[in-house]
């Protein structure tokens, strides 16, 4: 058995793992990152790259008015008592410090996403103007040979243009508002300038991971790809290393030991691609085919920690979002649910929620019950997004430009249905025609008045962010009445699972009795979320992942200094 030795071993190369490794290296600890996949970046690289950390230096430079007290009121209020208040406070108090460290030691550049509100902006302490920041486009050529190892983007943008989160909402208004035209010109100019100057610009999550990788290059931290974590190594009751194997080898291949003199930080994602774990912990219907999380996320870290007695929390939940299960690649729906001229109905042909609500809560409503939990299968799965031709002519849908034809393969699969009448559409989708027609008629009356009397769609600043400001009187309500009609099947997809290892304020793994598993730390989706069952705003996954990776590495360094 081959043996290597470092002070710190980090498992996983997403934002949590990279920040942890960066901190450890800058504190003088020899560090290695091991990654099962052939690319680094994990689900972070596939994401929008948003980071939700109130009162950080990027927001302050932009003059965003906020206070620690307001952020504390907001987060404690929406999370509730399911998460220890000390963990919430640690995140809020240390998150800005973490971000300043990262900005200092990497070429990462961040900017505010103006108007992208907190997901519950009307709650006490919530901000309609938003607290989310995102990475500016990054020239991946700066990575040198490591450019080839960057996790590919989840979705391909037409003409390979580089789009930021704040671009997308304006591009969706291209056919409806002058701001859409201006933003389209700006995005096009950015892309042409990059090509003319020989740059390979990347955006969103890849623009976050790329600079972090350069930070590790400068700090001398190797990132070992195709290196699958198989188990934890324990010596004298302390986690003192990891077993790994080449990802190309059979699972029965003899593992190699990498010793960790000071600690192991698990940052290897959730279990969204582990069918058995999903069936065990999560409510039916559930599958690995609806997630957009990185394919390497199969719960390896959670299972290894559980064998050592680690407590697991919130395993029944995920970073859900209503998703169109397109053949080969599910589509996580955002603006599609907010744009006027659409509704979501269950198999009874009835609405059951505010279609534009935050995506985690929307899937909780799809499942039914408190936080989506209850006996038996989910109550509103599948659901159907119903819209008309005017909606298609005006807005982006599942990556298709306004007016672009629905691909025949989508129609052939039955995931998308099309018909000249609502009754015919109902037949194709398996819905009761009379009920669907009545539901649409009632909704159309709300659209004309501008008031959703049933579910209050369009009343929240979050709803309106992805709405159409030129649509009056409500930017989220539009009549469905211009044939042909379309139906898109909706299922509870996710960005990744939520549940994982219970940790303390320093990211240390805990047992059920509250005792510490010495030498073992966890951050990101391998750990139970500080956000509980909720989601505070754009970047509410990546912000805590980075912060607790930072705190874990600092604790290891501090303990090493005491020895």
UniProtKB/Swiss-Prot annotation:
Q: What is this protein called?
A: 3-oxosteroid 1-dehydrogenase
This protein's species is: Mycobacterium tuberculosis (strain ATCC 25618 / H37Rv)
Reactions it catalyzes: a 3-oxosteroid + A = a 3-oxo-Delta(1)-steroid + AH2; a 3-oxo-Delta(4)-steroid + A = a 3-oxo-Delta(1,4)-steroid + AH2; 3-oxochol-4-en-22-oyl-CoA + NAD(+) = 3-oxochola-1,4-dien-22-oyl-CoA + NADH + H(+)
| Name of the coding gene | kstD
Q: What does this protein do?
A: Involved in the degradation of cholesterol. Has a clear preference for 3-ketosteroids with a saturated A-ring, displaying highest activity on 5alpha-AD (5alpha-androstane-3,17-dione) and 5alpha-T (5alpha-testosterone, also known as 17beta-hydroxy-5alpha-androstane-3-one). Is also involved in the formation of 3-keto-1,4-diene-steroid from 3-keto-4-ene-steroid.
What's this protein's family per the entry?
Answer: Belongs to the FAD-dependent oxidoreductase 2 family. 3-oxosteroid dehydrogenase subfamily.
Disruption of the gene: reported phenotype: Deletion mutant is unable to use cholesterol as a source of carbon and energy, and has a limited ability to multiply in resting human macrophages following infection, reflecting a failure of the mutant to inhibit the TLR2-dependent bactericidal activity of resting macrophages.
In the record, biological process GO terms are: cholesterol catabolic process; steroid biosynthetic process
Q: Where does FAD bind?
A: 7-36
